[in-house]
């Protein structure tokens, strides 16, 4: 599997783990150990998890947890006034938190790659407007934190 595909699998696994932490109230160390031992690259209930870059997975997961107090206000600022962060479901919050973490902390990864990867993850969970929301929020955040966007300004 190509390096980029392993990172994509790590991003998806990180979003799933963040969701699980949010819903079940699990801790980051417990979830990281569970995913690395039983999920990444393994078969679970007949479904095969893609092989993932475990280091990338850990970096996203621990980074989001450590920086959530910084990440959430950035997301709130990028959302429209009628869409508070608390109104978003756990999956969407996990996608946005992971994407914003990478935009803020992983300057070695191009904006277009980050936005595209997380929009694709959103498309795996949603069919309607949520992928567009992920695109718009991450584009706004990228303009704010990196001074560059992916496309038209959705503000």
Curated annotation (Swiss-Prot):
GO terms for cellular component: cytosol. Transmembrane segments: none annotated. It comes from the Bacteria. Keywords: RNA-binding, Transcription, Transcription antitermination, Transcription regulation. One of its GO terms (molecular function) is RNA binding. GO terms for biological process: DNA-templated transcription termination; transcription antitermination. Pfam families: NusB. Involved in transcription antitermination. Required for transcription of ribosomal RNA (rRNA) genes. Binds specifically to the boxA antiterminator sequence of the ribosomal RNA (rrn) operons. HAMAP family: NusB. Belongs to the NusB family. This is Transcription antitermination protein NusB.
């Amino acid at each position: 599997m190509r390096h980029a595909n392993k990172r994509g699998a790590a991003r998806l696994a990180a979003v799933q783990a963040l969701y699980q932490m949010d819903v079940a109230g699990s801790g980051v160390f417990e979830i990281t150990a569970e995913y690395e031992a039983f999920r990444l690259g393994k078969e679970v209930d007949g479904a095969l998890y893609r092989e993932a870059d475990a280091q990338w997975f850990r970096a996203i997961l621990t980074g989001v947890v450590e920086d959530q107090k910084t990440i959430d206000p950035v997301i709130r600022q990028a959302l429209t006034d009628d869409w508070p962060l608390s109104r978003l479901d756990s999956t969407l919050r996990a996608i946005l938190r992971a994407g914003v973490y990478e935009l803020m902390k992983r300057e070695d990864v191009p904006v277009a790659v980050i936005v595209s990867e997380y929009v694709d993850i959103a498309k795996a969970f949603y069919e309607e407007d949520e992928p567009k929301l992920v695109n718009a929020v991450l584009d706004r955040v990228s303009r704010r934190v990196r001074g560059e966007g992916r496309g038209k300004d959705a503000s």
